[in-house]
A protein has these predicted regions:
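Acidic Gly/Asp/Thr-rich repetitive segments characteristic of extracellular carbohydrate-active
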Residues: 36-70
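Bacterial N-terminal signal peptides that target proteins for export
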Residues: 1-9
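Right-handed parallel beta-helix/beta-spiral solenoid domain characteristic of secreted/periplasmic
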Residues: 44-47, 61-66, 79-121, 125
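C-terminal motif of bacterial Sec signal peptides marking the signal peptidase cleavage site
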Residues: 16-19
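Right-handed parallel beta-helix
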Residues: 85-88, 107-118, 130-144, 153-168, ...
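Acidic, glycine- and Ser/Thr-rich low-complexity intrinsically disordered tracts
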Residues: 63, 292-368
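Bacterial signal peptide processing site
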Residues: 21-24
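Short glycine/acidic-rich loop motifs that flank beta-strands on beta-rich extracellular proteins
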Residues: 69-75, 92-99, 120-126, 143-150, ...
């Protein structure tokens, strides 16, 4: 049931965002506990959420009373829904790597109105989960990743916040049919990252004070070798000039600070109706994964298992102004709109911008 509801939501949301002015124009109602009906269990303040999960039947709705819970949670049952009532925080009890870990047995998982804070690696990790909902979740200072669905599908990340992560605040990796909307990411290396994924949308979000606001990327060495059909629309992407604090040697440590929206190696990516301002390197860039590899000092053969060039990118109807004040890359200028010349079928149309490289950029045929 939840899977079908999420599929319906992900298909209809693009119609909701006709104005595409950002998160404040979202028409979808916020998620509340009432959406899930009568709860099957109530965790009292000071109780154990994990004990409630262990005792629950598949499909159970678990309501969590206000309070701070020092425990790490594991979910391996289908349809579990954890719903916070009031101010609910899950904090690291010691040296736990993951705050909430959901396995591939946890299809239909939902997490609503909860803060996850201070875990060593990941705030919320979903691995192989089909049909998930993360709504009004706040991920704060969780090592590398805040919200981290991987090998997952048919998911919605709605009105979440993520800050203080040395890789990515809100990440979708090697997944398909996922939408991120109405969310805020700040103070991370990457605010939002869509990596080696297809049929994914990032719509109506705000990213600021990250190294890069939104990164859409195809990387080598992963199980999924392609990334296509990505929509980045109606987002506010501004002032992403944070110094890069990723672990030295990690590929994220070579993401250039001052980046608004980066499209790196993916195919058929549409970037439309975003407002992108105040990013010191570039507002919206389209380039090859080989460029990121060059910054990392990797040889071209390191990318032999992927086709690293972006094809079919459409950059339309964006406002990209006040970017490019100071490029950190000697061989590329700081501009509002940037293309490294790689790939085929990439085009730009009806954008409002002050500078581009090259100039002019290729125009779209049948622009929308």
């Amino acid at each position: 049931m939840l899977r079908h509801a999420l599929l319906s939501l992900s298909l209809t949301l693009p119609l909701v965002f006709a104005a595409c002015d950002g998160a404040d124009r979202l028409a979808a109602p916020p998620v509340t506990a009432e959406r899930f009906g009568v709860p099957n269990a109530l965790v009292p303040s000071g109780g154990s959420i994990q004990a409630a999960i262990d005792a629950a039947a598949p499909g159970a709705v678990i309501l969590i009373s206000p309070g701070t819970y020092h425990e790490a949670l594991t979910v391996a049952k289908a349809g579990i829904k954890l719903v916070g009532r009031g101010d609910v925080t899950i904090e690291n009890p010691g040296d736990a790597e993951d705050g909430i870990s959901v396995s591939d047995a946890g299809d239909g998982f939902a997490l609503v109105n909860v803060t996850v804070r201070g875990f060593e690696e990941n705030g919320v990790l979903l691995t192989g989960v089909d049909g998930f909902l993360l709504a009004n979740v706040r991920a704060i200072d969780n090592g590398e990743y805040g919200l981290f669905p991987v090998f997952s599908s048919n998911g919605v990340i709605e009105r979440c916040r993520a800050s203080g992560h040395s890789d990515t605040g809100i990440y979708v990796g090697q997944s398909h049919h996922v939408i991120i909307f109405g969310s805020v990411a700040f103070g991370n290396v990457n605010g939002i990252e869509l990596e080696n994924s297809s049929d994914v949308q990032a719509v109506g979000n705000e990213t600021f004070d990250n190294v890069a606001g939104i990164l859409v990327v195809l990387l080598p060495g992963l199980d999924i070798k392609t990334s296509a059909n990505i929509l980045v629309a109606g987002n506010r992407v501004h002032d992403n000039n944070h110094p890069n604090f990723a672990a030295p040697g990690e590929i994220e440590s070579f993401v250039p600070s001052g980046s608004g929206i980066l499209v790196v190696g993916t195919d058929r990516t549409t970037v439309s109706q975003n407002v992108v301002t105040g990013n010191a390197f570039t507002g919206i860039a389209v380039g090859s994964t080989l460029l990121l590899g060059a910054l990392a000092g990797l040889p071209p053969e390191a990318f032999a298992d992927i086709e690293p060039n972006p094809d079919g990118a459409r950059i339309t109807r964006n406002v990209a102004t006040g970017n490019g004040a100071a490029s950190p890359i000697p061989f590329l200028p700081g501009v509002d709109l940037l293309w490294d010349g790689s790939g085929t079928g990439n085009c730009w149309e009806r954008n409002r911008f002050g500078s581009s490289y090259p100039a002019p950029l290729p125009a779209c045929v049948n622009a929308s």
